[in-house]
Regions:
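A compositional/biophysical signature of low hydrophobicity enriched in polar/charged and small residues
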Residues: 1-163
Length: 163
């Protein structure tokens, strides 16, 4: 008997999948545009999206900003190992306040966390690693990979319908 890793409370219907895919491509679509593409009235499309928001399927909306255009051209992935797991709560609180940290993932393997960071340059990255992480947060070790170019970066999430 297999046990699913994740369980949805309410199934995602085919029309919800279509709405989500449309919104992931264009989060600024009007209710009228969305309704037309879904074969619904604008109020029905709005109701469907609001239900997805209330269920937590849609967590929010954001502008996708080019980091280089706003002075943060350097992207790096930083694997972090904490000196002690007693430092975990303080580490997570501090990370959540750091603007340069775009993502923080608790991971399996040799390291504890994987961070995606955006910096102004290598000096900014060095300061983040040496001063912010290692000196202040009880980080035992970091391993950094600097991104040279990005072939694909997407906010699209693959979704399976359950009808």
């Amino acid at each position: 008997m297999s046990i699913p890793l994740f369980r949805r409370e309410t199934p995602i219907r085919a029309l919800d999948v279509k709405a989500l895919n449309l919104l992931m491509r264009n989060g600024r679509a009007t209710w009228a545009e969305l309704g037309q593409l879904l074969g619904l009235s604008a109020p029905s499309a709005a109701d469907r999206v609001r239900k997805l928001e209330q269920r937590g399927v849609i967590r929010g909306y954001a502008a996708l900003v080019d980091p280089a255009s706003v002075g943060h051209p350097l992207t790096a992935y930083v694997s972090v190992s904490l000196a002690s797991h007693r430092n975990r709560a303080a580490f997570l609180r501090a990370i959540s306040k750091m603007d340069q940290v775009a993502e923080c993932h608790h991971v399996a393997g040799d390291d504890d966390y994987l961070l995606k960071v955006r910096c102004r340059g290598t000096q900014d990255l060095d300061h983040l690693l040496a001063t912010e992480l290692k000196d202040k947060l009880g980080v035992a070790r970091t391993r950094t990979t600097i991104v040279l170019s990005t072939a694909k970066e997407s906010v699209h999430v693959p979704i399976d319908a359950v009808d």
